């Protein structure tokens, strides 16, 4: 080697230790203020709001995926010269946080009622200040480049003001109202809960079929079936399909209730499926969503038979006071005693909604609640996408968006909790009510509504409330609308749709239009929807399956860069992502490869310098620089389209398969030949590669780039621009032919039993005709060959077809005599053959197992088929080689 080592070569350790380096690098970024956004900047703006995680929680693998993608987007835009705001914050998580504090009180034998509302809320604030910061530390460990100076909480005073402001505007516009309607009720928490807080799972229950009306088959009667037989105490009708001939003569009549002094109207309703069961359904309007709709259509009575704790009430029967599950048995037994039970299926597997927080089956229940009238709001949210004001990525998710917003039901926004934004409605002594805005004072002696708002209400204001709305602020002017929302497709309705509804509702507000200097705005111009994280078998992660992985565990094992690269590499738009420890280990190995390549380049003098003119560059130089430009363009295209997987795959294969595996090896040959300009090409390639990788692998690239360039930080470095270097097709073909020739010679050597790097004399024919004269030194070095001596006698040879049309031939003759221990080679091959045959038998057995094929995910079966194919090829190769050694 003729080049001197780079002065910074000794600055790098001999190996990369993420645990020792990443936290220090992150602190350096914070101290330098790289992530602090300046609303007075003249740079173009780019802004993202972080979907606020629950203050009670910790980062799960879905968060890690989401944060990796947002960090990659903002880091790239910062390097492209944008003024970037990545807005962090946490959600007050009403039910979750109240539950945590109530559990702490329970340890001391106390309840929230013992403290009273005001002291309990103070207690929750104390908990938040002491224990609510865990997520921030985890985000730092992951490398999130958020603006911590702007960290917000959905119960901050500024955000509370925004909540009260929009509530009053919606109320004054007639879009918030109070009504008794059906909700998901949690008897344990004693509050309404949102659909998102209901988890459905299959349970083994019972299906009871019983008859209303006469026990005499010749007299009017109808058989119905239910899994919640206790709700028959609230039945007010029986519904049949209008075209069902079996019941047409009964429509308009009624049947007596066996336990309650009530006649059950027989109504015709198209909701009923005449092909299912008996074609007749019991109607309990106060305790079933479909029955409620039937009740509204037919103006049925809606008696509520369950109290807030799930006990039977107000039926006037002996069942009053019973728990719902106790009543289920008692009512069934009472029906059986009358001879009304026709059939009992037990166990009967069916799906039941359970409270995510408290775990018990939820109860649909008629309840007086506050609601948002969504029709006009949902239409505006839908129109924003139809008109192109907001673009959803991938486009395949648009139908799901429209299916939500075009068929949205009014939104229940009240919760029977103490922790949260209190509903700003006040009641007078004679039942009067008034909505009190943030700058108004309630009438003396009036009482405030005890309920709080659904957590999703305040988080729906997140894109603009965090920027200071309803006040006119420099942040709203600079960073609103936000550039892109990155979130999971699973909360498209619960969060995204509601942000769009509220965002379009205030879109023409003076604080947002800048007093009319710009038109109405949407909350974000792009929405990128990512998929869910699954385990390596393709199963959704859940605590019940025991397959949940803490991302911080993998960060500790492999480093944040390795986890981030794994997640980004697997993240295709809208597609789910399977992760495994092996995948993260492979990403760690990729980082090690980059580290070793950079260290090697520095030790051999790589340093930024002007590149020589193209005619001074070698084929290898022109090839690698041309490929680098192609990769840069592909990475730009991929990031612009939120195709993180495509960007990472392109960078991975270029860095590993082309730059490290080929160009570095060719650079050794060039440096040995005295081509000192090679150090500039090495540095140029590494410089651009590290910049392109930085958004996804920020820590390692920062350390390597600083060593290479001696400059301030990659965070503030420029993003690679088009280099103007086009692909030299002639040089690229020569390199492609050289690579094929080296690969074929190496494979042939292996088949001959030669060890890697064991040099043997060889002679090549047809090199000049194949336009490879300038590549002989590279082939000789990389294929571990030596020049033939005067007494060279070839013992084996191979032909390699080259050229774009495979019409050029290079013949390589090798003298392997005396280089192979035949007996030892046979023993080695026989051992390999036994292993290949064992793998072949194992995979064949699995693929012949019908039970396994029926249950295993397609991805697992595909992997086994691949293993079988490889084992078959290995068996054939080794068998052929053994035969040649006879």
UniProtKB/Swiss-Prot annotation:
List the keywords (alphabetical).
Aminoacyl-tRNA synthetase, ATP-binding, Coiled coil, Cytoplasm, Ligase, Nucleotide-binding, Protein biosynthesis
Coiled coil ranges (UniProt) are 819-851
Give the PANTHER family listed for this entry.
VALINE--TRNA LIGASE, CHLOROPLASTIC_MITOCHONDRIAL 2, VALYL-TRNA SYNTHETASES
Q: Which domain of life is it from?
A: Bacteria
- Name of the featured protein: Valine--tRNA ligase
Q: Which biological process, per GO, is one annotated for this protein?
A: valyl-tRNA aminoacylation
Family note: Belongs to the class-I aminoacyl-tRNA synthetase family. ValS type 1 subfamily.
* Catalysis: reaction(s): tRNA(Val) + L-valine + ATP = L-valyl-tRNA(Val) + AMP + diphosphate
The record's section on PROSITE patterns has: AA_TRNA_LIGASE_I
The record's subcellular location field reads: Cytoplasm
Name the residue ranges of motif: 'HIGH' region: 53-63
Q: Where is this motif: 'KMSKS' region?
A: 540-544
Q: What does this protein do?
A: Catalyzes the attachment of valine to tRNA(Val). As ValRS can inadvertently accommodate and process structurally similar amino acids such as threonine, to avoid such errors, it has a 'posttransfer' editing activity that hydrolyzes mischarged Thr-tRNA(Val) in a tRNA-dependent manner.
> Subunit arrangement?
Monomer.
Extract the GO molecular function terms from the UniProt entry: aminoacyl-tRNA deacylase activity; ATP binding; valine-tRNA ligase activity
Tell whether Ribonucleoprotein is among the UniProt keywords: no
Q: What EC number(s) would the UniProt record show?
A: 6.1.1.9
């Amino acid at each position: 080697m003729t080049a001197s080592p780079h002065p910074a070569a000794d600055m790098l350790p001999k190996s990369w230790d993420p645990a020792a380096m990443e936290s220090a690098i992150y602190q350096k970024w914070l101290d330098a203020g790289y992530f602090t956004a300046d609303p007075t900047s003249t740079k173009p703006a780019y802004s993202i709001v972080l979907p606020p995680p629950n203050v009670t929680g910790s980062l799960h693998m879905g968060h890690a995926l989401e944060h990796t993608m947002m960090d990659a987007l903002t880091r790239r835009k910062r390097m492209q010269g944008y003024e970037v705001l990545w807005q962090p914050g946490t959600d007050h998580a009403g039910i979750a946080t109240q539950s945590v504090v109530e559990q702490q009180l329970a340890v001391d034998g106390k309840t929230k009622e013992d403290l009273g509302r005001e002291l309990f809320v103070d207690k929750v604030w104390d908990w938040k200040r002491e224990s609510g910061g865990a997520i921030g530390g985890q985000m730092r460990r992951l490398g999130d480049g958020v603006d911590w100076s702007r960290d917000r909480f959905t119960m901050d005073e500024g955000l509370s003001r925004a909540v009260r402001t929009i509530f009053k505007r919606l109320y004054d516009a007639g879009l918030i109202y109070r009504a008794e309607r059906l909700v998901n009720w949690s008897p344990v928490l004693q509050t309404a809960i949102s659909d998102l807080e209901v988890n459905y799972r299959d349970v083994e229950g019972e299906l009871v079929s019983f008859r209303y009306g006469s026990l005499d088959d010749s007299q009017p009667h109808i058989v119905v079936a239910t899994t919640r037989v206790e709700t028959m105490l609230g039945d007010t009708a029986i519904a049949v399909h209008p075209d069902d001939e079996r019941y047409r003569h009964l429509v308009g009549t009624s049947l007596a209730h066996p336990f309650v002094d009530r006649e059950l109207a027989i109504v015709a309703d198209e909701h009923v499926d005449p092909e299912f069961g008996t074609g007749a359904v019991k109607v309990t309007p106060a305790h079933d969503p479909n029955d409620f709709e039937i009740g509204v259509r037919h103006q049925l009575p809606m008696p509520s038979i369950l109290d807030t704790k799930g006990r039977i009430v107000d039926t006037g029967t002996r069942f009053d006071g019973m728990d719902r599950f106790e009543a289920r048995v008692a009512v069934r037994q009472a029906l059986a005693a009358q001879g009304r039970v026709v059939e009992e299926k037990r166990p009967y597997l069916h799906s039941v909604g359970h409270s995510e927080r408290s775990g018990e089956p939820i109860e649909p229940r008629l309840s007086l609640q506050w609601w948002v009238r969504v029709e006009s709001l949902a239409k505006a949210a839908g129109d924003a996408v139809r008109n192109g004001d907001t673009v959803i990525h991938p486009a395949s998710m648009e139908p799901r968006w429209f299916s939500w917003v075009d068929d949205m039901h009014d939104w229940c926004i009240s919760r029977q909790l103490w922790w949260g934004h209190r509903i700003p409605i006040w009641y007078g002594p004679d039942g009067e009510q008034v909505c009190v805005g943030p700058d108004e004072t309630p009438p003396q002696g009036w009482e405030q509504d005890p309920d709080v708002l659904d957590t999703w209400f305040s988080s729906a204001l997140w894109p603009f409330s965090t920027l200071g709305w309803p006040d006119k602020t420099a942040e709203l002017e600079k960073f609103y609308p936000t550039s892109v929302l990155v979130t999971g497709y699973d909360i498209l309705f619960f969060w995204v749709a509601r942000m769009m509804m509220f965002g379009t509702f205030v879109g023409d507000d003076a604080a947002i239009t800048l007093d009319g200097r710009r038109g109405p705005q949407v909350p974000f111009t792009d929405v990128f929807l990512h998929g869910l994280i699954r385990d390596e078998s393709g199963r959704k992660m859940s605590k019940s399956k025991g397959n949940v992985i803490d991302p911080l565990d993998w960060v500790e094992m492999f480093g944040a860069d390795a986890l981030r690269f794994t997640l980004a590499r697997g993240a295709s738009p809208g597609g789910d992502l399977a992760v495994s420890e092996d995948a993260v280990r492979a990403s760690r190995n990729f980082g090690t490869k980059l580290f070793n390549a950079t260290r090697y380049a520095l030790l051999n003098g790589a340093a930024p310098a002007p590149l020589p003119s193209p005619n001074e560059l070698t084929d290898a130089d022109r090839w690698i620089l041309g490929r680098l430009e192609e990769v840069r363009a592909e990475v730009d295209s991929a990031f612009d389209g939120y195709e993180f997987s495509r960007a990472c795959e392109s960078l991975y294969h270029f860095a590993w398969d082309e730059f490290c595996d080929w160009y570095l090896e060719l650079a050794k040959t060039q440096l040995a030949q005295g081509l000192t300009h090679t150090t500039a090409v090495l540095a140029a390639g590494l410089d651009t590669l590290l910049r392109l990788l930085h958004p996804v692998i920020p820590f390692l690239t920062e350390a390597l780039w600083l060593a290479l360039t001696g400059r301030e930080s990659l965070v503030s470095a420029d993003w690679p621009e088009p280099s103007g270097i086009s692909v030299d097709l002639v040089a690229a073909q020569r390199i492609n032919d050289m690579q094929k020739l080296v690969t074929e010679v190496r494979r042939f050597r292996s088949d001959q039993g030669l060890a890697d790097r064991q040099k043997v004399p060889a002679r090549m024919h047809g090199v000049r005709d194949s336009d490879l004269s300038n590549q002989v030194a590279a082939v000789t070095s990389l294929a571990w060959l030596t020049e033939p001596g005067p007494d060279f006698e070839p013992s084996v040879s191979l032909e390699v077809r080259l050229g774009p049309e495979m019409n050029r031939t290079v013949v390589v003759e090798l003298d392997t005599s005396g280089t192979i221990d035949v007996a030892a080679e046979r023993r080695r091959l026989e051992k390999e053959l036994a292993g290949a045959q064992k793998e072949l038998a194992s995979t064949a057995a699995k693929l012949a197992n019908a039970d396994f094929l029926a249950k295993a995910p397609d991805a697992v079966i595909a992997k086994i088929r691949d293993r079988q194919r490889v084992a078959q090829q290995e068996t054939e190769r080794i068998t052929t080689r053994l035969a040649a050694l006879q």
